[in-house]
Amino acid sequence: MARGGWSGGLLTGVVVVMHAVVWFWRSRVVTEPYMDEAFHIPQTQEYCQGRFDQWDDKITTFPGLYLVMAVPSLVVRWASTVFPSSSPVHASLGFLLCSVKGLRLCNGLVFGGLSALLSFEILGEVHPGISSEDAFLNALAINLFPVYFFSADLYYTDAGSLALVLLALLLALRRRHRASGVAAVGAVLFRQTNVVWAAFVLAYDLHSQVNPKGRSGGLLGLPRDLGRVLRGAWVHRARLARNNWITVALMAAFAAFVAKNGGVVVGDRDAHKPKLHLAQFLYCCTAVAGAHFLVHFDPRSPFVRALSGASKARVLLIAAPLLAAFCLVIRRYTLVHPYTLADNRHYTFYVWKNYLGRSEVHRVALAPLHLFSAGSLVHRLARTQPPLVVLAAFACAAATTALAELLEFRYYITFYAIHSLLSEPMSRTKAAGTCAAFLAANVALEAVFLFRPFTWPDGSVARFMW
């Protein structure tokens, strides 16, 4: 099993060094809080000063990131009261820890490195026969995913959010059920929508406890798989309740919060109202499949071979109504958020302006690509996971994307990671090729971000980003 040892440590070191290089250049060029950092960094700095009664109403998330990142500074402040003779040193250290540079560094290195190690360990648990080399390359590819890698070195919630979801999953895989629940609580404190992925981890954990060897010959085994799990859950209900009560309590507490709060977000509710944007789920499927284009768009892939081996009549019988449904979704459930149209710093602005927003014909023309991508993703995951897990993964992906009006690629990060970890690992050649492609993309994106700024009419400097 690819577990622990030098490979996991080497992977973590490599990823940490990459984030450190990005941090070095951003610290030299982008010295002030950028984009949403303008909300996250001042809020954390308030907590660093012990002012927990201060809150910016424009912030939409729970304060998990700010609380965690304020802890080192608060410890230093406490140390200065215990050792007053060294208080000037403590004051300087506390300032550095909560500076723009310090917060970005801790966020990228700690959570970026943790996600890398957790990815490696999860691959070893889910795929016991995987070699250390293959686990290294597959985990590296996941952590180089350009949308994630770019965001991890900003003071955003993405890096910590993913790390805690992966920690909850790994602990569940290792039968540390209550610890997994605690990690899930942390994940939700970083980002509310992680309650959906906490539910996925719970479903995965329950399935493995009552039907540990449950595999299927495809989605046709869903009724049988569901029957086994329901029977097993009833028989072992007392044990399951003892093991998973923390995650269940989290779900109940979050439901109570939503009912009392009148929504999921904490602040800026008018701009973040849930709306049915089903087309975004299709974008998510295409983006995730496109990220592993060497796998999903390989003419020799298992999915393509399955299509080629099936009768044309059967393929047409299944594909035609699905394609019609996809076209209907695109026509009726495509939304565009005012932020997408107003902010030309984001690549999504240009995706909409130059293609998606040009006409309905342009959007509908992508329906076959969306269908192929979704089919390939389902087929690949179903090769290694039981039907209920496949269904749960895609249901959670839909829940975290299809209710968001804003076209935002960062919403796809967790599904990309979960799908990549639970699916059949890429071959060594394809994993290496994916790493190379991601690395090249990251270098290009970073160069544009740092060295190709432009000026807004008000004279402020703007930079291209996801």
Language model segments and positions:
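Short acidic/glycine- and proline-prone juxtamembrane loop motifs at membrane-interface regions
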Residues: 34, 147-160, 408-409
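Short hydrophobic/aromatic helix or loop-helix immediately within or flanking a transmembrane segment
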Residues: 43-47, 55-97
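Extracytoplasmic catalytic/substrate-binding loops of multi-pass membrane glycan-assembly enzymes
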Residues: 28-43, 52-72, 411, 455
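Membrane-interface alpha helices of multi-pass inner-membrane proteins
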Residues: 138-140, 146, 166-171, 177-192, ...
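Transmembrane-helix motifs of polytopic, lipid-linked glycan transferases
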Residues: 74, 101-128
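Membrane-lumen/periplasm interface segments of specific transmembrane helices
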Residues: 187-188, 194-351, 442-455
